[in-house]
């Protein structure tokens, strides 16, 4: 495991926690960029298969993605022992 993969797994855990069985396990999370200074800035992509999956992950008025992001950020802060800024982007996977 590298750091990016580990952080992606934390976000994946957040997705499974907040969306229960609504979304199939075909979702993948990729850590694009990690910037370390006084704190961590982490950019991740959540790759989904269909537009309907994207809508489910975003949730009404962005509530689902916000909950996933907050949970993931707090978990990352526990592990990394410093403040984190987490930026999530939901992207439709190209077939």
Where do the model's predicted regions map?
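C-terminal-of-GTPase-core extension/linker across diverse P-loop GTPases
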Residues: 1-95
């Amino acid at each position: 495991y590298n750091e990016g993969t580990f952080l992606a797994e934390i976000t994946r855990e957040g997705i499974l926690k907040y969306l229960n069985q609504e979304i199939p396990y075909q979702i993948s999370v990729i850590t694009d960029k990690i910037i370390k200074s006084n704190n961590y800035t982490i950019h991740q992509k959540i790759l989904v298969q269909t537009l309907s999956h994207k809508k489910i992950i975003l949730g009404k008025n962005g509530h689902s993605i916000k909950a996933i992001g907050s949970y993931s950020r707090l978990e990352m802060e526990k592990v990394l022992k410093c403040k984190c800024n987490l930026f999530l982007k939901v992207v439709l996977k190209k077939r």
